[in-house]
Amino acid sequence: MAHDAETSVVKFKNQDFRTLRDHCLSRGQLFIDDTFPAAASSIGEKLLRGKHLSKLEWKRPTSKDLPFYPPHFILEGASRFDIHQGIAGDCWFLAALGSLTQNPQCLQKILMDQSYSHQYAGIFQFRFWQCGQWVEVVIDDQLPVIGDNFLFVHPRGGNKEFWPCLMEKAYAKLLGSYSQLHYGYLPDALVDLTGGVVTIINLHSSPFDLLTTVKTAIQAGSMVACATENGLTEEAKVMENGLVSQHAYTVTGAEKIQYQGRWEDIIRLWNPWGKTEWKGRWKDGSKEWRETHDPRKSQLYENKEDGEFWMSCQDFQENFSCLFICNQIPITMDHGVTPNESWRQMRFTNQVISRNRAGGHGRDMQYVFSVQEHTAGNNVVVAFTIMPQSLNTEEERFPLQFQVFKVPQFQNVQGRLPPAFFSPFRSAAQGTKYVSKCNFTKSFHLNPGTYVVVTTANGKEVEFLLRIFLKMPDKHRDPSSNFNLRALKESLPENGSRNSISYTYMDQGLDIDATQLQSLLNQEFLTGPPGDTFSLDQCQSIMALMDLKVNGRLDQEEFARLRSRLIHCQHIFQSIQRRPGVLLSSDLWKVIENTDFLVGIFISSELLSLMALRYSDSSGRVSFPTLVCFLIRLETMAKAFRNLSKDGKGIYLTETEWMNLVMYS
């Protein structure tokens, strides 16, 4: 049955970390894991072909004859640069892991609190998510080496950090052997590390704003990764442009950068190999980096052979096939990434379906859900996750298939729907799907009504988890959990700092469009965790109100005028807010009263009440970006009336004049 209970933790192979560690400590022994022995069987034949098996040894990082002695579990924080891929083709797992390092809080949940310096007994534990529950995997720290070289993931340079090596071993144990890591699906690793749901974007066919998508997704704590297409062979090969075919990369950032008097979108990637980088535009040491005068250059760029590099977003979309975004809720792409959307989840765990030998829907399983109200874009995501034990390594197709049908409005669903319901004339709902080895996800836009998910098995008995995500209308959003007001930075002085980002752009006389304005405002005026930032829609609105030339851009003079108002709004917000980041709609009259650029503007109590409804959330709170939009619009509309009125009492406009005024503002 469906439930929303707290996810449980299961001991893999019934091994309890504390019991085993304490037993070893009491006897002065180092743990030896008989369930995943230091033997060729734990590696697998596929990865041992052609290797010098006579020289293969298993050593602990504490061995003094290794160049990494003394070892550390983590030293000065976990980073993607601690990872260096070995002979296994597990870039799909390491790219996901590299992305997870950008969210230290989530990473700590699976790394646990352990070290080589405190209560060391040769035993370590890690957590992975499988079919609705966290699985705790215990390993010993014996790692396969040939000479001084680790066969699989090994520490980079001289940092002596072994958390990536040990975590890779734990994941290999969970899947059965190191060979099971050799080629896999990036979405499966993202789900196994987080328990989230993956949104897959086809870079060749999806019209979307790549820069905004990546920046917003990362700010929302999402894991973001990508993959190149297959080459001419089954093996991953380095291409002439420096990219690797059939290879996974971590997406670590995206920026809009100034170059030759214009703006260019660039994206930053990391290669789990720890080397081998892009050789095209914006590569390390490129003329683009030498010639750019962007003030953030020193913050963004460092010429190092560490596997991380920048490339233009245009080159990225031409050379990569898919972008993968993993979050605890679906990320819909209909109107850009909106991480504050509210979703409800129905979860069906430990589901078992037997093989359907008779065909049709006679042995199917059915799950009913309802869509209550109209919402924009994709509003239902159906996600199946298969238990690894149910997978057949020889079978390429997914072991389940499913469809979603709408139940007629007046048909009462009690128990199973009969086979007659699924006539050849009843069409299934159409959605966007993605299938990997362990996960099958479909996204739908469904009208209000009752629906049934019908699934059948393709082969043997299958155990699975089903999650149905339902988007809630904005009014159902829980403000305490889904709405984080972002804190304002300390007030900027009226004359500004010559080192501020916006002043640098003003000095260079560059025009700014709405996307650039969004980036500047969020960097200069807001700080703290992701939450209510200046959205692109708000910046387009501000742009229209301040754009005197009506060309869709702000010149130096227009931006300077906007900046002075923003600083004044900042002072007002901070002086009237009830607590950091929270201004109540009931205090809007105080705001208007204290806003210098609104002097002489009259606003009735009736209009003030309407504005409180228009610009506050369901809890009566007004964010700083929303307040800015309100105050600038109020000033602009009042000035427009005065300019158009001949007697100060009223105005006469043609339909065209009226439409021009209200539609571009």
From Swiss-Prot:
Q: What is its EC number?
A: 3.4.22.-
Q: Which residues form the Calpain catalytic domain?
A: 30-329
Check the record and name the InterPro entries matching this protein.
Calpain_cysteine_protease, Calpain_domain_III, Calpain_III_sf, CAPN3/13-like_C_EFh, EF-hand-dom_pair, EF_hand_dom, Papain-like_cys_pep_sf, Pept_cys_AS
Q: Which CDD domains match?
A: CysPc (cd00044), EFh_PEF_CAPN13_14 (cd16195)
Keyword Hydrolase tagged: yes
* Any GO MF annotation of the entry: calcium ion binding
Q: Name one GO biological process term.
A: proteolysis
Top-level EC class as recorded in UniProt: hydrolase
Tell whether Hydrolase is among the UniProt keywords.
yes
**Keywords attached to this entry:** Hydrolase, Protease, Repeat, Thiol protease
**Catalytic site:** 91, 247, 271
Per the record, the domain of life is Eukaryota
Recorded hits in Pfam families, A to Z, give:
Calpain_III, CAPN13-like_C_EFh, Peptidase_C2
Name all EF-hand domain ranges: 534-569, 632-665
> What does this chain do?
Probable non-lysosomal thiol-protease.
The similarity annotation says: Belongs to the peptidase C2 family.
**Designated name of the protein:** Calpain-13
